[in-house]
C-alpha cells in the first residue's frame, strides 16, 4: 500500500464532544457543542451527532480566531476539543457546512458570511 497515515492522539476526557466555532472576518459569529452518539465516537452532525449552544472561554475564542488568521481564512469552521490541558485545535475547515449551527444558535451564519464577502468586495480586497 502506497499511502500516508495520519495518527491522532485520543483525548479521553473529551467524551466524544467537540466545539464547532464559526469565524467570519476575524470574529466568532456562532459556536456549538457537538456530542457523539453511543454507536460512534465522532460528533459530526451528518453522522447523527447531537448539538447544543455553548459559551466559549476567552481562550477558546482567541484560539479559533488565531487559527483562521494564521491560515489566511476570512471564513472558517474551527473544531476544538476541551481537555485537561486546555483547548486543543482539532481541525480547521475552509469551507464549513452550516448544518446544525444556525438552528441551535439562532444566528443567521449565512448572512454573516454574505455581509463579510460584500464588504471585502466593495473595498477591493480581492482584486
Tell me what each language-model feature is.
Residues 1-71:
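Phosphate-binding site of ATP-dependent enzymes
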Residues 6, 29-30, 76, 88-90:
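Protein kinase-like catalytic core scaffold
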Residues 16-18, 75, 87:
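Active-site lining segments that contact anionic ligands and/or coordinate catalytic metals
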Residues 55, 69, 82-127:
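C-terminal active-site "lid" helix and adjoining low-complexity regulatory extension at the edge
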Residues 78-80:
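Hydrophobic residue at the +6 position relative to the catalytic HRD Asp in the kinase catalytic loop
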